[in-house]
Amino acid sequence: MLKRFPTPILKVYWPFFVAGAAVYYGMSKAADLSSNTKEFINDPRNPRFAKGGKFVEVD
């Protein structure tokens, strides 16, 4: 059995956890915006097609 030590993990590293969550959220939004641009909207690798999406007519 491992001995437990009162090491303050959350108290010390909370800024890194918050920053990691913010970066994850920002990259997710950037990827969504990028996949819906004119250049990539009809790419067969777009996740929209896995959900049954149709091709979009681009001007």
From Swiss-Prot:
Pfam families attached to this UniProt entry: ATP-synt_J
Gene: ATP18
InterPro entries for the chain: ATP_synth_F0_jsu
Subunit structure as annotated in this protein's UniProt entry: F-type ATPases have 2 components, CF(1) - the catalytic core - and CF(0) - the membrane proton channel. In yeast, the dimeric form of ATP synthase consists of 17 polypeptides: alpha, beta, gamma, delta, epsilon, 4 (B), 5 (OSCP), 6 (A), 8, 9 (C), d, E (Tim11), f, g, h, i/j and k.
GO MF annotation: an example: proton transmembrane transporter activity
Entry membrane topology: Single-pass membrane protein
Keyword annotations of the record: ATP synthesis, CF(0), Hydrogen ion transport, Ion transport, Membrane, Mitochondrion, Transmembrane, Transmembrane helix, Transport
Record's keyword annotation contains Coiled coil: no
Coiled-coil residue windows: none
Major localization listed first in the record, in broad terms: mitochondrion
GO cellular component, one term: proton-transporting ATP synthase complex
This protein's name: ATP synthase subunit J, mitochondrial
Subcellular location as annotated: Mitochondrion membrane
More about this protein: Present with 6540 molecules/cell in log phase SD medium.
Source species: Saccharomyces cerevisiae (strain ATCC 204508 / S288c)
Family note: Belongs to the ATPase j subunit family.
GO biological process: mitochondrial proton-transporting ATP synthase complex assembly; protein-containing complex assembly; proton motive force-driven ATP synthesis
Domain of life: Eukaryota
Listed transmembrane segments: 9-25
Role this protein plays: Mitochondrial membrane ATP synthase (F(1)F(0) ATP synthase or Complex V) produces ATP from ADP in the presence of a proton gradient across the membrane which is generated by electron transport complexes of the respiratory chain. F-type ATPases consist of two structural domains, F(1) - containing the extramembraneous catalytic core and F(0) - containing the membrane proton channel, linked together by a central stalk and a peripheral stalk. During catalysis, ATP synthesis in the catalytic domain of F(1) is coupled via a rotary mechanism of the central stalk subunits to proton translocation.
